Amino acid sequence: DLGLMDIKNGDLPEKVKRNTKTRRARVNKRILGRSIDERSPRIESRKDFGHWECDLVLGHKTKDDDVLLTLCERKTRQFFMIKIEDKTSASVMKAFDKLREYYGSKWNQIFKSITTDNGSEFADLSDLEQVSKTIVYYAHPYTSCDKGSVERHNGLIRRY
């Protein structure tokens, strides 16, 4: 826009699809569990394996559309997509129960922490802390950049 580079807006697919809108003040939702502010600096530095970001990708928002539970490991950027029935906390927990069953005794080494947003579909996720050593952190409300790796992958899924 400033004309500093020889690039047009049409060359930037992310910029073209975003509409600039006036900002509105939002009333923040309450954080469901442990805040992302309590996360260790070691997790922030991406030095250790086993710290995951989690989100949902919805289809075209019709009643029968597919929903994907996406998980991205912070250090290696390893990425999982799990198709779930719907956008409910019961479906999300069922997917995590299947993952726990699949990994068995290795679960605690692979999933040390999970960072997710404050959506109602993740309300029961803190129950994982009771049945395993996995710590669940909730991002700040309306701040998707708190879990940027998984959001980047989700953008690629939506594009293709």
Regions found by a protein language model. Give the residues of each.
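Two-metal-ion RNase H-like nuclease active-site motif
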Residues: 49-60
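Short, structured coil segments at secondary-structure junctions
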Residues: 131-132
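Active-site beta-loop-alpha junctions of metal-dependent nucleic acid enzymes
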Residues: 60, 64, 81-106
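Conserved, well-structured core segments that form or line functional sites
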Residues: 88, 106-107, 111-113, 118, ...
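RNase H-like two-metal-ion nuclease catalytic core shared by retroviral integrases
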Residues: 116-119, 123-126, 138-160
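Mobile genetic element proteins and their domesticated derivatives, centered on retroelements
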Residues: 55, 71, 77, 96, ...
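Short conserved beta-strand segments at catalytic cores or DNA/RNA-binding microdomains
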Residues: 44, 57, 63-80, 96
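Basic, flexible linker segments flanking DNA-binding modules
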Residues: 1-45
